[in-house]
Amino acid sequence: MAAKHVLFSTDARQKMLSGVNLLANAVKVTLGPKGRHVVLNKSYGAPTITKDGVSVAKEIELADKFENMGAQMLKQVASKANDEAGDGTTTATVLAQALINEGMKAVAAGMNPMDLKRGIDKAVSAAVEKLHQLAKPCSDTQSITQVGAISANSDHAIGEIIAQAMEKVGRNGVITVEEGQALQNELSVVEGMQFDRGYLSPYFINQPKAGCVELENPYVLLVDKKISHIRELLPILESVAKASRSLLIIAEDVDGDALATLVVNSMRGIIKVAAVKAPGFGEQRKAMLEDIAALTAGRVISEEIGLELEKVTLDDLGSAKKVTINKDNTTIVDGAAEPSALQDRIAQIQHQLEHTTSQYDRDKLQQRIAKLSGGVAVIKIGAATEVEMKEKKDRVDDALHATRAAVEEGIVAGGGVALLKIANELSNLQGDNDDQNVGIRIALRAMEEPLRQIAINAGDEASVIANQVKTGDEHYGYNAATGQFGNMLEMGILDPAKVTRSALQFAASIAGLMITTEAMVSEVDKESAA
């Protein structure tokens, strides 16, 4: 077993604090509309220029192992805030740094770390309650635009495109961000359900100019297995031909004489037919087939439940108004499902979403809900260079998460104003003893720090700005972009309540752990051991 290096009490906390400050000082310069850029060197390619706090935090590894422990713990604050609300990473880092620095001073002065932690927790709980009271619902397009713009570092074009996307696909809709080919941002909305599987043979194409297959009012056959022999399909093909309708076959795979016969029939015009592979793999494929069945009011033909392909009737098939298939995607528009049946399926997936812990599964379930709800919006980012593209994409991702958070828990005055006002209101909060009172004071002072840092980054005097803001009503604040004081909501400077709440809670959580740390253990470096 490798030898270990152990540090205790003040020595341990001092090393940890040094790591915290190194990381926080690099991250906090990005806060606010006049936040500075940080340039990140990559082992390959051009350096990345960013104003995204979590991107900066992720890049930092320190040489000293004890300092690095402090930096990595602070990094957790940024990534947790990012996971919870998708934004507020820099705010969370600034709050945590203020709490840790003041907390360490109090511990060094001989105060009880556990009581300090209790005091901080008490102040944070009271602040979260006040935050919920202050929050105003965010449902109109203008508010969503403003939240998106603020989160994207005051880029109104990004705020507007996100608001348009949310308007088109609804709250449950999936909005994806991709790198575009043009210089301008573009928004495209896919109506109906789309999945990433194209036609199995180009000979199915009936729209040569567009290079796609279009089926009007088709039946939809869903099969949970590979189809290789045409005899399995003959009975249902004859029934569909008699009904003078087209047919879409979605199966695990279609090959051999089954595919050849379908192609020949399609080319001769005997029956309009197209075959595609089912989306997904394994259990995911079965779930997706069930979703398509719910959308088209059909059944999944599976031998697991005793349904055989040769015995399928027209009643087992789903149907849709239109299906478009190109080499990469299949889009089903206006499935024949009853709205109530579709809502039941969505509720079922929603239930799974609430009980899953994996982020990957959450994303997949969210996508399935969106596809059933009838829309996926794609924002294509336009930029002149690759470096600008990466930086812009990060900002759009942040803005997208922030707007979702705003719709979920409402909005409060931005620019650090909400936390400063709450700290002011809680100035008379008392703990059970003097050490707890010190913890409460530390937390309330830390809540002023985001506004102060925004002012510093804008080149203003933080104390003057903070004192001026304290004199006004609950929405009165400072617009660092223009240098003006006024009503933050009217000026369109808004923060999602969820982002502010999660930043404060995660910062307090990590600060509490660090303040109460009494020993640190790390492996001895081989060089120093030698």
From Swiss-Prot:
Subcellular location: Cytoplasm
Enzyme class per UniProt: isomerase
This protein's UniProt keywords: ATP-binding, Chaperone, Cytoplasm, Isomerase, Nucleotide-binding
InterPro entries xrefs: Chaperonin_Cpn60_CS (IPR018370), Cpn60/GroEL (IPR001844), Cpn60/GroEL/TCP-1 (IPR002423), GroEL-like_apical_dom_sf (IPR027409), GROEL-like_equatorial_sf (IPR027413), TCP-1-like_intermed_sf (IPR027410)
Presence of keyword DNA damage: no
Subunit structure: Forms a cylinder of 14 subunits composed of two heptameric rings stacked back-to-back. Interacts with the co-chaperonin GroES.
Role description: Together with its co-chaperonin GroES, plays an essential role in assisting protein folding. The GroEL-GroES system forms a nano-cage that allows encapsulation of the non-native substrate proteins and provides a physical environment optimized to promote and accelerate protein folding.
Family the entry assigns: Belongs to the chaperonin (HSP60) family.
Matches recorded under HAMAP family: CH60 (MF_00600)
Protein's name according to its UniProt entry: Chaperonin GroEL 2
Underlying gene: groEL2
